[in-house]
Amino acid sequence: MSVLIICEKPSVAKTVALALGAAEQKDGYLSGDGLLVSWCIGHLISMADAGSYDERYKKWRYEELPILPQTWKYAPTPGKEKQLAILKELLHRSDVSEVVNGCDAGREGELIFRFVYEQAGCTKPFSRLWISSMEDSAIREGFAGRRAGTEYDALYQSALCRARADWLVGINATRLFSVLYHKTLNVGRVLSPTLNLLVERDGKITMFHKEKYHIVHIGCGGVDAESERISDAAAADTLRTTCEASQAVCCLLYTSDAADE
């Protein structure tokens, strides 16, 4: 029987395969020593477009908003159909007894694998290869200590929530603002706040005016201090005069070994 490992990228799959002794190159995967090592190319499965839910959603109309799917649909990512077909065939091979999620150790890696596994209709047991190093020793150790895939169900659900939230915000908000302003305006959960940061920063640069300010410096035998920026020259001079007429007092002494820092 064989174990199928699915990695997130071809380069990672090759590194994992060579570390585990699967060096024979096939079409879309590597094999050897009882292992089949294949790969995704990022997301092979994506959230289906709104038009796939109902014909009326193929046109952008204000009256059809919001679009809130009750049952979610998925579709192959354009241009990646061949590798998806290879993975589906491997997942259903009779000699494959176990599937290993070898995608990147993180939320998105979990989603990339689960989408393929579930859309392929695979029911074989699957485990998780969770590694952050591409050293041969780390790969072999991670493979030997792989854990049941179900232990990462919460991570998968988190990734699924993120993907669906992106879809809901992106599809509905993009259509809404595009219809209202009569031109395509892309809106997204990450895109829009990021764009806002750039707009705010650009506005600050545009509205920036040079201002004079004053800082009062105090030197006390090697223990120096300084005030915040003071825009009023008279206030800064008053602070300087007050400090010159005063005596500095040590309120706290703290010592430490250099090794502790």
Range-by-range predicted roles:
Residues 1-163, 167:
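Intrinsically disordered, low-complexity regulatory segments
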Residues 139-218:
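C-terminal or mid-to-C-terminal helical accessory/interaction module adjacent to the motor/catalytic core
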Residues 257-261:
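A short, hydrophobic C-terminal helix/tail in secreted or cell-surface proteins
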Residues 87, 139, 165, 177, ...:
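Generic structural signal of hydrophobic/aromatic residues within well-ordered alpha-helices
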Residues 45-77, 89, 185-256:
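Long, highly charged, low-complexity internal segments
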